[in-house]
Amino acid sequence: MAFLRQTLWILWTFTMVIGQDNEKCSQKTLIGYRLKMSRDGDIAVGETVELRCRSGYTTYARNITATCLQGGTWSEPTATCNKKSCPNPGEIQNGKVIFHGGQDALKYGANISYVCNEGYFLVGREYVRYCMIGASGQMAWSSSPPFCEKEKCHRPKIENGDFKPDKDYYEYNDAVHFECNEGYTLVGPHSIACAVNNTWTSNMPTCELAGCKFPSVTHGYPIQGFSLTYKHKQSVTFACNDGFVLRGSPTITCNVTEWDPPLPKCVLEDIDDPNNSNPGRLHPTPNEKPNGNVFQRSNYTEPPTKPEDTHTAATCDTNCEQPPKILPTSEGFNETTTSNTITKQLEDEKTTSQPNTHITSALTSMKAKGNFTNKTNNSTDLHIASTPTSQDDATPSIPSVQTPNYNTNAPTRTLTSLHIEEGPSNSTTSEKATASTLSHNSHKNDTGGIYTTLNKTTQLPSTNKPTNSQAKSSTKPRVETHNKTTSNPAISLTDSADVPQRPREPTLPPIFRPPASKNRYLEKQLVIGLLTAVALTCGLITLFHYLFFR
């Protein structure tokens, strides 16, 4: 029982304390006032205090009092503290001032803002000003007023064109007129004006290559707006020839470099077409092409075939035992007959061919078989023999070549005959082919003629110029001899001056010959000496200037 009484006592005491705290008045609720005697904490209920106006407020009364009431409220103060007012902010040129707060717009805590007229923009640190207590304790605005400046635009840019007037900058509503260079068309407005925020009233125009290509409509022609050249925004109207109808827009306009809408088309008029404005009109006669082909709508005629292109082939109805024979055409080719004919001709030529007397061709042919050697120089004829490996290696037919005649008045000379001996190495029989004697007109001069001899290294004819003694001895006729006892066939060269040849042209001396190495060395040393002298001279001049003129 005692414990219960003690608990109730504690709860009652706590409630009374809380109730007393709630009955106090806060100093913060005194708007525009503050305690004349500063103190901390809240004011108890029923207590009366002296007040004064806060900063930014003013009153005409000397003493102001207020009492704390039940519920934590204050009684009405005996005098009113009113807000102080800031001075008139004034007007702004090319703009206006906007006041906020109604009647208290110029009083303590109020704010004002500035707005410029169209075509102007604000210039200043702050666009909003507040009424506040200044450094001296007087009411003042928070900042200096801004001002309105006219809008400006930068210089425009246009390629392949120009604009007028040309200025460093343009103010609001200043107009600029554009024009393009020759050969270009202006696409866009011809004039624009400066707007707000460094912008223009429209997008910048451009200068494009002027004109469109000449419009060509097949089976059509222009009836209005014909011109050789078409500029931007220029139009042309088309019509079709008789027998053709227009598909598309008859009038097209040049848009920069393209036609808008696209070019129309002229098509053949169809009498069954319900959209045909002229029913019953006949189709025009199509033009014949040079090759004879005729082309019409839904009509195509193949060109006639040539008679020689027609081939007749045998046909069988049923049960063919052998394939039919293909008849040859007028220009046909019989492969079997031709092959047999060619084979027979080759055999006849091999049988009837005789060795030729041209010495150069014969030597070349024998060299290819590899059966010739060089005999002693004292021999008086040229003996060539070869051993064929088969019957097919008979002496081939060598075409004769006529030796040119250089001098018709020169005496006739006889060349050594060529003897060709062929046969198997183990057989006593041999086929002898004696080359006919060649007669040439040799040209004589003081130094002797030029003749062809067999080169010992290459085993081929070469051109030599004999000495006077050789030239004199070569005038004697040559006698053909054959060495039949020799087992090894060989080539014997006796006289190297047999075939006259055209003399070679002399070798010209070189146009430019490099200078001797000694002269070039002297020139190099001379250049080095000159450069050294120049360097020493410059050094002496610099030293002289440093010593006497510094």
UniProtKB/Swiss-Prot annotation:
InterPro entries: Compl-Cell_Adhes-Reg (IPR050350), Sushi/SCR/CCP_sf (IPR035976), Sushi_SCR_CCP_dom (IPR000436). Residues 23-83, 84-150, 151-209, 210-268 form the Sushi domain. It is a single-pass type I membrane protein. One of its GO terms (cellular component) is host cell membrane. The chain crosses the membrane at residues 528-548. Disulfide bonds join 25-68, 53-81, 86-131, 116-148, 153-194, 180-207, 212-254, 240-266. The keyword Signal applies. Glycans are attached at residues 63, 111, 197, 255, 275, 299, 334, 371, 374, 378, 426, 445, 455, 483. Pfam families: Sushi (PF00084). GO terms for biological process: symbiont-mediated suppression of host complement activation. SUPFAM superfamilies: Complement control module/SCR domain. Residues 269-338, 387-408, 420-516 are annotated as: Disordered. It is found in: Host membrane; Virion membrane. The keyword Transmembrane applies. Residues 1-19 form the signal peptide. It comes from the Viruses. CDD domains: CCP. Keywords: Disulfide bond, Glycoprotein, Host membrane, Host-virus interaction, Inhibition of host complement factors by virus, Membrane, Repeat, Signal, Sushi, Transmembrane, Transmembrane helix, Viral immunoevasion, Virion. Inhibits the complement component of the host innate immune response. Regulates host C3 convertases, accelerating their decay, and acts as a cofactor for factor I degradation of C4b and C3b. Also binds heparin, and therefore may play two distinct roles when incorporated in virion membranes: immune evasion and host cell binding. This is Complement control protein. It comes from Human herpesvirus 8 type P (isolate GK18) (HHV-8). The lineage of its organism: Viruses, Duplodnaviria, Heunggongvirae, Peploviricota, Herviviricetes. The gene is ORF4.
